[in-house]
A protein has these predicted regions:
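Conserved SAM/SAH-binding beta-strand->alpha-helix loop
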Residues: 4-5
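C-terminal substrate-binding/active-site "lid" region of AdoMet-derived donor-dependent transferases
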Residues: 63-106
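A short, conserved alpha-helix within the catalytic core of class I
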Residues: 52-59
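Short SAM/SAH-binding signature in class I
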Residues: 40-46
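Conserved small/polar residues in nucleotide/adenosyl-binding loops
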Residues: 169-176
Length: 176
């Protein structure tokens, strides 16, 4: 499912090439609106901002409540997505992180939960992923070292520019 026709056409080609045309149906849909509650066991919501991921789950709550699991890969606002999930009846049961073409992508498998898990996560765990931290995920460690290096470079520039205006262009170049 996708809200745009182009990605559906490309997905249909991949499905056909994989010989899965009978098992996979394509639908043009805004979020989960073209699904009925109980129609599917799982969804993948990936390749979009965290705000949109949260909106899809909120607007499609009737469907989301009947899912056995969701695979999520938000590309921004990761901590907000984790907090939203934990406050809205989901438990994060698995986390992964990959590096592709210089960009870090966290992913999570979530399942419905009867109780709020929010109080079990501190701010660091929300930001970087409790399960990723617990497993000392090698890609997370690489990401943290990169962040440390970028922040050190910014601090060094600030030290050298004492009395000069701060270059916001330089700071923006280091945003993730």
């Amino acid at each position: 499912m996708d809200v745009n026709e182009g990605p559906l056409i490309r997905a249909e080609e991949h499905v056909r090439e994989a010989g899965l045309k009978e098992q996979i149906k394509m639908r043009r849909s805004n979020g989960l609106e073209k699904l009925s509650p109980g129609e599917v066991e799982a969804v993948i919501i990936a390749g979009m901002g965290g705000g949109l991921v949260m909106r899809i789950l909120t607007e499609g709550q009737a469907v989301a409540e009947t899912l056995q699991e969701c695979i999520l890969q938000p590309q921004s606002e990761i901590a907000k997505v984790r907090e939203f999930l934990l406050q809205n009846g989901y438990q994060i049961v698995q986390e992964e992180m990959v590096l592709d073409e210089g960009k870090y992508y966290p992913m999570m498998r979530v399942v419905p939960s009867k109780e709020s898990e929010r109080e079990k996560w501190d701010e660091t765990q929300l930001r970087y992923g409790k399960l990723l931290l617990e497993m000392r995920h090698p890609i997370l460690e690489q990401y943290l070292k990169r962040e440390e290096q970028l922040k050190a470079e910014i601090l060094e520039k600030l030290d050298h520019q004492r009395g000069e205006p701060v270059s916001y262009t330089h700071l923006r170049a280091h945003e993730t």
